[in-house]
């Protein structure tokens, strides 16, 4: 087995990953797994750590944290271009860790590591976003779910919040605040050749099935089918949205009259309002944004 680089976000899940890492490290050592590791020290640090790992010749990089950590590792590993020689892995540890749900990995990090050490891989689709950030064009990859609207506003507010209370309390506070203040926004959305102009509560561009800590947002999504599943929550009242949320966990929201599901390989999103774009729960920029899919571009352990 080639040497593995493990990139650990010790503050993920309110510090639980940092507490679990010594046990995971001990497990890897007991199995004789050749590995190096690096601990992230600040937001976006995993991007540079993954890029440095590639520069040092590592071919297998595993993220131990949440979906945000995985997103950073993904972007660092492919900083110099999408490479078929790089194999990625993800160990659930963050508040959401939704991509590993789609992979079917155990929630326990040691059991998940034992599973991926079997060496099975699959080719999964890669999403690419082009948007604006601080007045310049920004490109970002994602592998699970991206989008805009309500969820992006919650993410933006949470990311700006002080970290002294961990991640859960600021998230719940900003979720409640956004529920009180958020209104549907006007969007222009182009799905391949189909153009929609409408007011929407949120727009989700999904490669994986889950987001938001187990919400079954795209039940029909497949990681390797070469297309996005786009879920649009059309203009609705706060009460309609609140009553819809429990259905998302069951996947039955897709039958709601104000939820529309589309398939597309290319998605354009724009608005006359300033709208944030999130990928794996991290704000990557603002609209206008273009989402493209690279079919089966990533070799992933599962």
PLM features: residue spans?
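ATP/NTP phosphate-donor binding region
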Residues: 1-64, 75, 194
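Short hydrophobic segments within beta-strands
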Residues: 7, 91, 231-233
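Alpha-helical membrane-targeting segments
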Residues: 26, 162-186, 235-259
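Catalytic core of DAGKc-family lipid kinases
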Residues: 31, 40, 79-201
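Short glycine/serine/threonine-rich phosphate/pyrophosphate-binding segments
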Residues: 46, 68-73, 98, 124
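Short Gly/Thr/Asp-enriched flexible loops that form oxyanion-binding sites at enzyme active sites
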Residues: 69-83
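Glycine-rich phosphate/pyrophosphate-binding beta-alpha loops
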Residues: 147, 151, 204-217, 283
């Amino acid at each position: 087995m080639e040497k593995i680089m493990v990139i650990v976000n010790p503050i993920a899940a309110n510090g639980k990953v940092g507490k679990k890492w010594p046990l995971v490290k001990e497990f890897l050592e007991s199995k004789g797994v050749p590995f190096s590791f690096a601990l992230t020290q600040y937001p976006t640090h995993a991007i540079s750590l993954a890029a440095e790992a590639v520069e040092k010749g590592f071919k297998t990089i595993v993220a131990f944290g949440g979906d945000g950590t995985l997103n950073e590792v993904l972007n660092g590993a492919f900083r110099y271009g999408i490479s078929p020689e790089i194999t990625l892995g993800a160990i659930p540890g963050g508040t959401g860790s939704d991509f590993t749900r789609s992979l079917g990995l155990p929630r326990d990090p040691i059991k998940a590591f034992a599973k991926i050490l079997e060496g099975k891989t699959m080719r999964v689709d890669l999403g690419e976003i082009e948007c604006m950030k601080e007045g310049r064009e920004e490109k970002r990859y994602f592998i699970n779910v991206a989008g805009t609207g309500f969820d992006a506003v919650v993410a933006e507010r949470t990311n700006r919040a002080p970290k002294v209370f961990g991640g859960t309390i600021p998230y719940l506070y900003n979720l409640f605040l956004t529920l009180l203040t958020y209104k549907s926004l006007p969007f222009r959305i182009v799905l391949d050749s189909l153009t929609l102009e409408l007011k929407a509560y949120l727009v989700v561009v999904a490669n994986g099935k889950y987001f938001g800590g187990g919400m079954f947002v795209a039940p029909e999504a497949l990681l390797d089918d070469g297309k996005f599943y786009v879920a649009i929550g059309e203009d609705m009242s706060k009460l309609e949205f609140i009553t819809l949320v429990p259905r998302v966990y069951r996947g039955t929201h897709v039958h709601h009259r104000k939820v529309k599901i589309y398939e597309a390989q290319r998605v354009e999103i724009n608005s006359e309002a300033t709208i944030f774009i999130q990928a794996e729960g991290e704000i990557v920029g603002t609209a206008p944004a273009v989402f493209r899919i690279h079919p089966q571009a990533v070799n992933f352990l599962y």
